UniProtKB/Swiss-Prot annotation:
Alphabetical UniProt keywords: Cell membrane, Lipoprotein, Membrane, Myristate
Main location: membrane
Topological category with respect to the lipid bilayer: Lipid-anchor
GO CC list: plasma membrane
Tissue specificity annotation: Expressed in the 2 embryonic head hypodermal cells XXXL/R.
Mutation effect (G85E): In mg348; wild-type lifespan. Moderate increase in constitutive dauer larva formation at 27 degrees Celsius
Impact after mutating G2A: Probable loss of myristoylation. Loss of membrane localization
GO process terms (BP): dauer larval development
Organism this protein belongs to: Caenorhabditis elegans
Intracellular or extracellular location(s): Cell membrane
Protein name: Protein eak-4
Function comment: Together with eak-6 and sdf-9, negatively regulates dauer larva formation downstream of the insulin-like receptor daf-2 and in parallel with age-1, pdk-1 and akt-1.
Lipidation (N-myristoyl glycine): G2
Length: 247
């Protein structure tokens, strides 16, 4: 993932936006994808913004100068890739835990809204109704999903337990694929034979990832806290054969 972000930063620093080859990574190939050929500067900048920042409106050159765009871009990269658990908690640990869990619940709730939105698009398609409004609503839900994930990344900065980095990695994997999901949803309204199966697979992954993060948190933090509030990690290592693997 760090290599992907490094590629993006080199693109943003370039004056000419040269042709970028298709990335070889299978895990994050949706993170940066460029069609063959040369983009004009505005299109290239918008393309970079679209894939890295699925929740943000496309930023045009007349709206932001290059330095300001670069500053916002670097700040977002730092939020996504920085290690979790860097900051010591200054208030009651329960406050941080409740905020952390509330954000996780919001991620799951939003992912389920994505599933409902996709179902609405399918029902409109089967009835031969216009799809534009349904597609737009679903794309806006993807934007909201990105914002919630970013809020979770901020909450992950606190050293809540020894697994905040692992859970952030799970969230990061889902976050980086939101742009690919958004494209799949947009294509539903652009083809006579829309590929609902592809969009459904991507939505199901978002739901699965959200459920996995919540389950991991409850098993490694909430249950551990009930067992022994003074030693969460010790309980987890006793209960789980490999606490760093998905449950």
């Amino acid at each position: 993932m760090g290599q992907c972000l490094a590629v993006h930063r080199r693109i943003m620093a370039s004056q000419e936006f040269p042709n970028i080859p298709q990335p070889e990574s299978q895990c994050h190939d949706a993170f940066i994808r460029y069609s063959p050929g040369r983009y004009e500067r505005r299109a290239a900048r918008s393309q970079v913004d679209y894939y890295l920042l699925p929740q943000a409106p496309r930023l045009m050159t007349e709206d932001l100068d290059k330095k300001e765009f670069q500053r916002l871009y670097d700040a977002r990269c730092e939020l996504v890739e920085c290690p979790a658990g860097r900051r010591a908690m200054q208030l009651d640990v329960q406050i941080y835990a409740d905020r952390y869990e509330a954000t996780l619940n919001k991620i799951l709730e939003t992912s389920q809204e994505l599933d409902k939105g996709l179902e609405d698009i399918f029902q409109a398609y089967t009835k031969d109704d216009p799809l534009a409004d349904k597609v737009m609503n679903c794309r806006l839900t993807v934007d909201e999903m990105g914002r919630v994930y970013e809020h979770f990344f901020r909450e992950s900065a606190w050293n809540l337990d020894s697994f905040v980095e692992y859970r952030k990695n799970l969230a990061r994997d889902a976050y980086l694929l939101l742009a690919d999901l958004k494209i799949a949803i947009q294509r539903l309204g652009m083809h006579f034979n829309p590929n609902f199966e592809d969009a459904q697979v991507k939505v199901d992954f978002q739901i699965m990832q959200a459920e996995q993060i919540i389950f991991h948190f409850k098993r490694t933090y909430r249950d551990a806290l009930k067992h022994n509030p003074d030693s969460i990690t010790e309980f987890v290592e006793d209960e789980l054969e490999d606490p760093g693997t998905p449950l």
